[in-house]
Design a protein with these regions (language model features):
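Beta-lactam-recognizing serine transpeptidase/beta-lactamase-like catalytic domain environment
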Residues: 1-173
Length: 174
């Protein structure tokens, strides 16, 4: 349990004593709420707009244009300052809680698209469910691959994320 602005941040295993000190990679492997929220809060608490703009740059909030009823793009709130320089739509807990998925609305397909983008060396592809529609052996409609963003982050950052995710897969399968 970690106190944050009058609230308690917990990991799923808090009743068993939690994880203790973690590296960045371990924080991601274990999906530690405390670790992620502390890292993000430490680095962005004085400039939460920078954090949200960084998320926007990855395309996580992009409209995937999924042709299904009810499909909507992710909603990730940008903090706004009033004329006095105070945030009018933001609390001290907003950033740490947003960093672990609260205070946002991110459909699973957006999360999957993000992970696919990391696996695809940073190139974001529009999700598609079929490549073509055929009738009587004839192709009547095609859905070619569509690039949404050529590169969502620096190549070095993508490679580091790939390494962490590959290590997690290896760790989890042992």
């Amino acid at each position: 349990i970690w106190p944050m602005y009058g609230r308690e941040m917990k990991d799923h295993n808090w009743r068993k004593g939690g994880y203790g000190m973690l590296t960045l990679a371990q924080t991601l492997w274990y999906s530690s709420n405390i670790g992620v929220s502390r890292i993000i809060d430490d680095h962005y608490r004085n400039n939460p707009e920078k954090f949200v703009k960084g998320i926007y740059r990855t395309g996580l909030h992009d409209d995937l244009k999924i042709p299904l009823v009810g499909a909507t793009p992710a909603r990730i709130r940008m903090p706004h300052r009033n004329k006095n320089g105070q945030y009018d739509n933001w609390a001290k807990t907003s950033l740490p809680w947003m960093s672990i998925g609260y205070e946002t609305q991110v459909p699973p397909i957006s999360t999957l698209t993000f992970y696919n983008t990391i696996a695809n060396n940073g190139k974001m592809m529009r999700p598609r469910f079929v490549s073509k529609v055929m009738k009587n052996g004839e192709t009547i409609m095609e859905f070619p691959p569509e690039v949404m963003r050529q590169q969502i982050a620096k190549e070095k950052s993508i490679k580091e994320l790939q390494t962490i995710l590959e290590q997690e897969i290896g760790r989890a399968s042992c």
